[in-house]
A protein has these predicted regions:
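A structural signal for beta-strand boundary/capping segments at domain termini and interdomain linkers
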Residues: 82-83, 174-176
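Proline-centered linker/hinge motifs at extracellular inter-domain junctions
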Residues: 2, 30, 97, 188-189
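Short, surface-exposed alpha-helix to beta-strand junction/turn motifs within ectodomains of secreted
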Residues: 26-47, 119-139
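Conserved structural position at the C-terminal beta-strand
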Residues: 75-77, 167-169
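Short, solvent-exposed loop/linker segments at the N-terminal edge
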Residues: 7-15, 104-110, 196-198
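Surface-exposed, short loops/turns at beta-strand junctions within beta-sandwich domains
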Residues: 61-69, 154-162
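Flexible, low-complexity linkers/stalks enriched in Thr/Pro that connect modular domains
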Residues: 86-96, 179-188, 196
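A short glycine/threonine-centered beta-strand motif
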Residues: 16-27, 110-124
């Protein structure tokens, strides 16, 4: 029967793909029309997307609009031989993260703002964020995904003016939050002090 050698956790969204590596994918007559790849008991091709046998050692799974699910992948050949990737769990995730609130709208370097919502974390995999199109860094901001419902953002050394927070979940679903944050490290400037003699 076919063998596979993947041993990691993978997240996939509606336009994402997964590649399975191994052997015996063609010489055993494996074909997607035979329901040859399953996520737990669900046939991948009919439930989630398409299966493409690229060669004897590679299969590509494309995820369509199927619902959210998680489980281990099983590969089945025409003879009925099957192999389950026992240490490999697939998360099919077509649900975007949702942001409901930002605790403050303006922070300076070292100050924090808390973004709350849902879908920020899936198992050990965490979402990433950008603010005003900028990635995290010492001069922009840093962040910690505290839980699936909370992200703590810390202001960096530079400035970001009214930047929209965009959350990308572990599967790659991108969510514009309609929540904005300004990082402001510019001190007010006093040019003169006028006095008046009475």
């Amino acid at each position: 029967g076919p063998d596979s050698d993947n041993d990691k956790l993978v997240h996939v969204k509606s336009d994402g793909t997964i590649t399975i590596l191994g052997s015996g994918f063609t010489n055993s007559g494996i074909a997607s029309s035979d329901g040859s790849v399953k996520l737990e008991s669900d046939d991948w091709a009919s439930t989630y997307g398409t299966v493409t046998v690229n060669n004897d050692g590679q299969i590509t799974l494309a995820n369509g609009s199927g619902g959210n699910a998680s489980g281990r992948i099983t590969v089945l050949d025409f003879a009925g031989n099957e192999t389950t990737v026992s240490d490999y769990t697939i998360f099919v995730d077509n649900t975007k993260a949702v942001s409901t609130n930002i605790s403050v709208g303006v922070v300076k370097q070292g100050a924090t703002a808390v973004l709350t919502g849902t879908g920020f974390k899936n198992g050990d995999a965490e979402s990433t964020i950008t603010i005003g199109g900028q990635n995290a860094g010492a001069t922009t901001f840093t962040y910690t995904v505290d839980s699936g419902t909370q992200i703590t953002i810390t202001g960096g050394s530079g400035d970001i003016n009214d930047g929209e927070i965009v959350v990308t979940d572990p599967a790659g679903n991108v969510s514009t939050t309609n929540k904005k944050l300004t990082v402001d490290n510019t001190k007010p400037s006093v040019s003169s002090v006028a006095t008046e003699t009475i």
